[in-house]
Swiss-Prot record:
It is found in: Cell membrane. InterPro entries: ECF_substrate-spec-like, UPF0397. Keywords: Cell membrane, Membrane, Transmembrane, Transmembrane helix. The keyword Magnesium does not apply. HAMAP family: UPF0397 (MF_01572). This is UPF0397 protein SAOUHSC_03020. Belongs to the UPF0397 family. One of its GO terms (cellular component) is plasma membrane. It comes from Staphylococcus aureus (strain NCTC 8325 / PS 47). Its main location: membrane. The chain crosses the membrane at residues 11-31, 44-64, 77-97, 116-136, 148-168. It is a multi-pass membrane protein.
């Protein structure tokens, strides 16, 4: 089996993606009134980076970005949610493999596929995995963390569904469509 190297382009994407994730996570959030639960724009951006550069870039961007955001905001990381940011980035990247955004096409069928995938991924990560890890790692009360998880899942579904879809459409539209250039 041939060893696959990580390209410089992917490493740069992870670094820039993590930095933008931190900025969005710190400064472009809308509070919900429920403790530690916000409408996050950073996950829509994570969906874009993941769809363009793949599951590994999504995983690393989510992990590094969320960890730095937590350290700079709270002084320490809430590892159960950091892990889930990595998982969701990987899942967005996996969904993005089928989208083929570089072809310049992001059809309604692709939008539906992306949104069904992100809905399932957000429910798995935020409503199931994150609260379960909170209980196992931090001994948090189940009713509190599952409520936070469900609220976060719904808010991320909405944020990624609207902002993420717009970002993916804008990116695909900026690409040259295959066969659109003709030799004269």
């Amino acid at each position: 089996m041939k060893k696959q190297d990580i390209s410089v382009k992917t490493v740069v994407a992870i670094g820039i993606g993590a930095a933008v994730f931190v900025i969005l996570g710190r400064f472009v959030v809308i509070p919900t009134g429920f403790p530690n639960t916000n409408i996050e724009t950073s996950y829509a951006f994570l969906a874009l980076i993941s769809a363009i550069f793949g599951p590994f870039a999504g995983l690393m961007t989510g992990l590094v970005g969320h960890a730095i955001k937590d350290f700079t905001t709270y002084g320490s990381a809430w590892w159960s949610w950091v892990i889930c940011s990595g998982i969701i980035g990987c899942l967005y990247g996996w969904i993005g493999l089928k989208l083929n955004l570089s072809s310049g096409r992001f059809s309604r069928k692709s939008m539906v596929y992306f949104n069904i995938g992100q809905i399932i991924a957000n429910i798995i990560c935020w409503a199931l995995i994150a609260p379960t890890l909170d209980i196992l790692i931090y001994n948090e009360p189940a009713n509190k963390v599952y409520t936070q998880g469900v609220i976060s899942a719904v808010l991320n579904i909405i944020s990624v569904g609207i902002i993420g879809t717009i970002l993916l459409k804008a990116y695909a539209s900026s690409q040259i469509k295959k066969g659109s250039l003709r030799k004269e």
